[in-house]
């Protein structure tokens, strides 16, 4: 897999073609580390989009670079790279031992920011819930935050995940 494969216009067909090649090589970590930090946001975005095509089992091979993915989500200025990196993070294991409070704060901030894109807000809520599940006091704080959202300012995707959590209908993927 080369950088050239990820340049330019990139649709579902291209994402699946690159994913199929990646699947054959099986080197998901090398692929992610080679391209997710690319200076061309299109390359980084296309690489991360390709990774979202992977099965949960395949993505689990990225567990050793969880912190790199978190750093990318926190620091990138590109909303597509942020959303796609958060999508990958959401599918990895977050435990009490690898929980990062800076990422939890980031998720809280982006979950309630009405100026943020709905896809990022929804993922931020899911990830915050996942991280708060280890600590009843943090979970209570998240629930209070979700209850106090002025929900009329949010898009349906955000309303949906918020309501599912508040009604106890959202289940964390293990």
Set out the residue ranges of the language-model regions.
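Alpha-helical scaffold domains
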Residues: 1-174
């Amino acid at each position: 897999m080369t950088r050239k494969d990820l340049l330019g216009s990139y649709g579902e067909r291209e994402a699946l073609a690159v994913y199929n090649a990646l699947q054959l090589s099986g080197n998901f970590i090398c692929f992610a580390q080679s391209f997710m930090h690319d200076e061309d946001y299109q390359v980084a975005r296309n690489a991360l989009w390709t990774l979202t095509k992977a099965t949960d089992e395949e993505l689990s091979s990225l567990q050793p670079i969880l912190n790199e993915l978190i750093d990318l989500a926190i620091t990138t200025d590109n909303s597509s790279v942020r959303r796609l990196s958060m999508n990958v993070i959401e599918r990895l294991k977050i435990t009490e031992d690898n929980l990062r409070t800076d990422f939890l704060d980031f998720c809280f901030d982006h979950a309630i920011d009405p100026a943020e894109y709905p896809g990022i807000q929804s993922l931020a809520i899911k990830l915050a819930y996942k991280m708060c599940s280890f600590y009843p006091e943090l979970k209570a704080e998240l629930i209070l935050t979700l209850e106090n959202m002025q929900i009329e300012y949010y898009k349906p995707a955000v309303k949906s995940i918020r309501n599912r959590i508040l009604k106890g209908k959202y289940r964390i993927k293990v």
